[in-house]
């Protein structure tokens, strides 16, 4: 016999440590610690001992007893299938009315395992002495549980051919409680007398008590969907053809809320026990880890909550408006901004692919982001809640204060000789001065080139040299994981012998010693802080270049993407307003990106500030000083909108849901994902454990080159599908085509997915205007693939689902061709991560003499993964075959301790491909930890 404490996963949220430390009940053997050692379908008995008086979290123990011997003692030997038999009087919870099993569960367990079957048993089931003994033993070991009422649940795991979700609730007598001594078996009819009934039953032994119990049995391996009966006050829903279901509690919260590949290995019991007006509610989740798991049903789409939709900034009419007249639509969006000189034409596409938007208009970007909000009377509104990495290092800056800082910086830059059209390199951590520097440049018509502060001196040098920057703005150092690291040192190396650089402006951030070059180097506080707060912004042409942002190129030389003023700000402001449904008067928005990337430019600086929003800017890493840091920040500022990357979401998944569960995240009302396609499991985990099971998620697709979001759900309109970017935003035109440019048609969900190329077939306001100094490279890179049609080639593979929604699969070089089948690395990675034992996965294609390309996978396992590496590899191959196709089974699966990632969190698949094909590694300078390849090679 084994005894253990199980904690509730819902309110009251008692942790296992809380319960066990309070009552000194220690498991000698964890139940099902080795599920492979037990017969797969053998029943077990769980006896839940709760104290007679409901008490708060941590004071009421929950003892779980499992015993193979006890289970065998309660297995019927001469009774019909499905009858729960015992040897002493008890009250079965499923007796009449609501207690009827609905629908019946049909089991294919052979009679030799269940005993002979004939007829129907009615009358009084009996509890065996071994059951009573086990209960007494368990309860006696929990001192606070002595004299408790013991609720027994006999559960038999159904074989693969059965698929059901059953609800068991007690019959209620006139007094509202079942009788302890008069109980009946579940009613049956002549028509179903021969049908095997569920072995699930609930018995209440002891004092009368009202008991509500829900259990979701696993559906079949064939994914036949099942209907869950609904108890009063609860609801259930299923996804078409996906073999998934959700059973919700009385509070309409999913009991099964993570992905099907996790839930398929779990049995969840949600129990509410009431005495008079007082109720105790708890959920118990029991891992079964079956060797051939099937999939639970979960919704395939998640519509927005009714109250969210009713108050959303964007409605479905926005699509119709844009469809009716696309240019008139963009004209209306541009007029949300303040133009010193109105534009005369919306678009000039005569020199395609070089676009001109809002022709003739003049605008100042910084004025639109700062001054106009102050002039509108919102100067006291907080623009930035800045949180430094060292705990306690924080400050809040209002729009009026931000305006003063930007004006001072603009005056200082003017004094240094900068004029419109010059370039400034910004190499800084996430501190307010970085945003001030960007806005000061925009105010002057000076192009800023922000370089991620994690890049090396050589990478910085290449960008300074290409842009011919006159000024570099940096800081003495930055904080990373609690330590101060130098930045000025890298700048000194990068600007050595650079004739274009006249000055280096340095912010004091960490106080570390730095080398100093007199005549070139200047302290920010001595230069900017002394300048005047009065500055009149000049208006610039709509096509005035706003910034350069370098992105990686296939040739190895970074591409300087050029974005201009009017079109970029129009789309940045429009998408931020509608995709994130921002309410400037009440929202606190947080985008976790770095300003060194385009997400930081558009959705930290220009989008939020143009809309007058209050936002959080955080300097440090998500796990410094602890893995709770992000959630502490959300709590501290009452963040309502949270926009982050799938990489970080998967990091949180590996840390465990108990981390976000220990914080009050109820302020969150919208979540966003950016940077790469998000796998459905991470999407559902994100919604359930960070969004409280209710927040809409906007999965956004866009690029450095597009400047702003292009494909995304509208949160108040779209029933979002986990893993899908859904449809182009109003005003955006995108399609998926084959090699010849023919548009693909929506395919059946269960059929083999047909992958095509994602293209943009109409110009858009925030589109890049070129590659700095290389117009031919601009044409060759983005417009030559479908030059005849005049389409922008995004470089991403994508597919349509049966509803015509877009699923972006990643870079086209991440689409493998295996025996003529085009298979996305993202699809295979999603299938692998869907396994309950996998924390993270990366997939690449490697050359293969037979199939052209073969699939190679690199997998990080969870600490809780069962079985040895060889067994796990076979399980994962089978998982991919089941989820996608046998043709997609990886040729190689390597279990590794870590994956190679850049400082922006992206997996370097190019280097994994080098490993898979046995080549020497390419450049590893952008990796966080190049030494990870030693462990990866050791795994081969």
Curated annotation (Swiss-Prot):
Q: Which GO terms describe its cellular component?
A: cytosol
**Enzyme Commission number, as recorded:** 6.2.1.1
Q: Where is this region: Unknown?
A: 1-289
**Which residues are recorded as binding Mg(2+)?**
833, 835, 838
Task: Show the segment(s) annotated as Disordered.
Answer: 70-127, 157-202, 224-274
**Post-translational modification, as annotated:** Acetylated on Lys-906 by Pat in the presence of acetyl-CoA as an acetyl donor and ATP. Acetylation results in the inactivation of the enzyme. Deacetylation by the SIR2-homolog deacetylase CobB is required to activate the enzyme.
List N6-acetyllysine occurrences by residue.
906
The reaction(s) this protein catalyses = acetate + ATP + CoA = acetyl-CoA + AMP + diphosphate
A GO molecular function held by the record: ATP binding
Q: Where is the composition biased (Low complexity)?
A: 184-202, 224-245
Give one GO biological process term.
acetyl-CoA biosynthetic process from acetate
Q: Which residues bind CoA?
A: 480-483, 599, 819
**Quick one: which residues bind ATP?**
675-677, 699-704, 796, 811, 822
Cofactor(s) essential for the protein: Mg(2+)
Residue ranges, compositional bias (Polar residues): 72-95, 107-120, 258-274
This protein's UniProt keywords: Acetylation, ATP-binding, Ligase, Magnesium, Metal-binding, Nucleotide-binding, Signal
Q: Where is this region: Acetyl-coenzyme A synthetase?
A: 290-940
Please give the function described in this protein's UniProt entry.
Catalyzes the conversion of acetate into acetyl-CoA (AcCoA), an essential intermediate at the junction of anabolic and catabolic pathways. AcsA undergoes a two-step reaction. In the first half reaction, AcsA combines acetate with ATP to form acetyl-adenylate (AcAMP) intermediate. In the second half reaction, it can then transfer the acetyl group from AcAMP to the sulfhydryl group of CoA, forming the product AcCoA.
The protein in question is named Acetyl-coenzyme A synthetase
Species of origin: Mycolicibacterium smegmatis (strain ATCC 700084 / mc(2)155)
């Amino acid at each position: 016999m084994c005894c253990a404490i199980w904690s509730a996963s819902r309110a009251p949220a008692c942790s296992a440590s809380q319960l066990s430390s309070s009552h000194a009940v220690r498991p000698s053997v964890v139940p099902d610690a080795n599920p492979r050692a037990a017969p797969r379908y053998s029943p077990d008995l769980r006896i839940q001992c709760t104290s007679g008086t409901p008490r708060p979290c941590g004071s009421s123990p929950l003892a779980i007893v499992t015993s193979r011997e006890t289970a065998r003692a309660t297995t019927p030997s001469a009774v019909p299938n499905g009858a729960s038999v015992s040897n002493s009087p008890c009250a079965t919870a499923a007796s009449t009315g609501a207690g009827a099993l609905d629908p019946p569960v049909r089991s294919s367990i052979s009679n030799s395992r269940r005993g002979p079957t004939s007829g129907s048993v009615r009358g009084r089931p009996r509890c065996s002495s071994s059951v009573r003994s086990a209960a007494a033993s368990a309860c006696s070991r929990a001192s606070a549980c002595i004299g408790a009422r013991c609720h027994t649940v006999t559960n038999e795991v159904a074989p693969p051919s059965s698929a059901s979700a059953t609800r068991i609730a007690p019959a209620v007598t006139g007094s509202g409680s079942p009788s302890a001594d008069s109980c009946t078996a579940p009613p049956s009819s002549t028509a179903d007398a021969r049908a095997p009934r569920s072995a699930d039953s609930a018995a209440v032994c002891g004092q009368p008590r009202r008991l509500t119990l829900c259990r979701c049995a696993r559906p079949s391996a064939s994914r036949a969907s099942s209907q869950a009966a609904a108890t009063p006050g609860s609801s259930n829903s299923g996804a078409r053809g996906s073999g998934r279901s959700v059973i919700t509690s009385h509070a309409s919260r999913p009991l099964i809320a993570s992905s099907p590949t996790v839930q398929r290995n779990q049995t969840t019991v949600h129990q509410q026990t009431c005495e008079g007006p007082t109720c105790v509610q708890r959920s118990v989740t029991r891992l079964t880890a079956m060797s051939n798991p099937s999939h639970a049903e979960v919704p395939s789409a998640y519509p927005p909550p009714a109250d969210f939709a009713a108050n959303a900034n964007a409605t479905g009419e926005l699509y119709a408006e844009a469809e009716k007249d696309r240019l008139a639509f963009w004209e209306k969006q541009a007029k949300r901004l303040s133009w010193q000189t109105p534009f005369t034409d919306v678009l000039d596409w005569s020199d395609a692919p070089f676009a001109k938007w809002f022709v003739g208009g003049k605008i100042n970007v910084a004025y639109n982001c700062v001054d106009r909000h102050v002039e509108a009377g919102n100067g006291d509104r907080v623009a930035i809640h800045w949180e430094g990495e060292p705990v306690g290092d924080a400050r809040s800056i209002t729009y009026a204060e931000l305006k003063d800082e930007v004006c001072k910086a603009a005056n200082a830059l003017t004094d240094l000789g900068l004029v419109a059209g010059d370039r400034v390199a910004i190499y800084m951590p996430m501190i307010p001065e970085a945003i001030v520097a960007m806005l000061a440049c925009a105010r002057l018509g000076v192009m800023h080139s922000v370089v991620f502060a994690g890049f090396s001196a050589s990478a910085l040098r290449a960008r300074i040299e290409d842009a011919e920057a006159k000024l570099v703005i940096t800081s003495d150092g930055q904080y990373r994981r609690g330590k101060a690291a130098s930045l000025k040192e890298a700048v000194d190396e990068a600007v050595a012998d650079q004739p274009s650089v006249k000055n280096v402006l340095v912010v004091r951030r960490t106080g570390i010693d730095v080398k100093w070059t007199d005549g070139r180097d200047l302290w920010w506080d001595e230069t900017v802080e002394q300048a005047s707060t009065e500055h009149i912004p000049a208006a610039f042409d709509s096509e005035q270049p706003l910034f350069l942002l370098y992105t990686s190129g296939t040739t190895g030389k970074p591409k300087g993407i050029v974005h201009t003023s009017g079109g970029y700000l129009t789309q940045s402001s429009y998408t931020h307003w509608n995709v994130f449904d921002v309410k400037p008067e009440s929202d606190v928005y947080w985008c976790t990106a770095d300003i060194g990337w385009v997400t930081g430019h558009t959705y930290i600086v220009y989008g939020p500030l143009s809309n007058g929003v209050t936002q959080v800017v955080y300097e440090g890493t998500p796990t410094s000083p602890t893995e709770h840091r992000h959630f502490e920040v959300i709590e501290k500022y009452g963040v309502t909108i949270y926009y982050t990357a799938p990489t970080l979401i998967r990091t949180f998944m590996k840390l465990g849901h108990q981390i976000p569960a220990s914080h009050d995240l109820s302020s969150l009302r919208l979540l966003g994902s950016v940077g790469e396609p998000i796998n459905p499991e991470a999407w559902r985990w994100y919604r359930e454990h960070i969004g409280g099971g209710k927040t809409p998620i906007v999965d956004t697709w866009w690029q450095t080159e597009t400047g702003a979001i292009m494909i995304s759900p509208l949160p108040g309109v779209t029933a979002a599908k986990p893993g899908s970017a859904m449809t182009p935003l109003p005003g955006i035109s995108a399609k998926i085509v084959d090699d010849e440019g023919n548009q693909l048609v929506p395919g059946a969900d269960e059929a083999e997915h047909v992958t095509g190329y994602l293209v943009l077939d109409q110009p858009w306001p925030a589109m890049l205007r070129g590659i700095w100094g290389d117009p031919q490279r601009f044409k060759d890179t983005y417009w030559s693939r479908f030059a005849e049609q005049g389409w922008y080639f995004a470089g991403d593979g994508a597919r349509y689902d049966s509803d015509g929604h877009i699923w972006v699969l990643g870079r086209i070089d991440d689409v493998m061709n295996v025996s003529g089948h085009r298979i996305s690395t993202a699809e295979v990675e999603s299938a692998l991560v869907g396994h309950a034992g996998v924390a993270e996965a990366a997939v690449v294609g490697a050359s293969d003499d037979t199939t052209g390309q073969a699939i190679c996978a690199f997998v990080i396992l969870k600490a809780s993964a069962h079985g040895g590496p060889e067994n796990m590899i076979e399980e994962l191959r089978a998982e991919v075959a089941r989820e996608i196709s046998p043709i997609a089974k990886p040729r190689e699966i390597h279990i590794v301790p870590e994956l190679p990632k850049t400082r922006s969190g992206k997996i370097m698949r190019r280097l994994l491909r080098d490993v898979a094909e046995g080549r020497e590694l390419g450049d590893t300078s952008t990796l966080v930890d190049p030494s990870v390849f030693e462990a990866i090679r050791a795994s081969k």
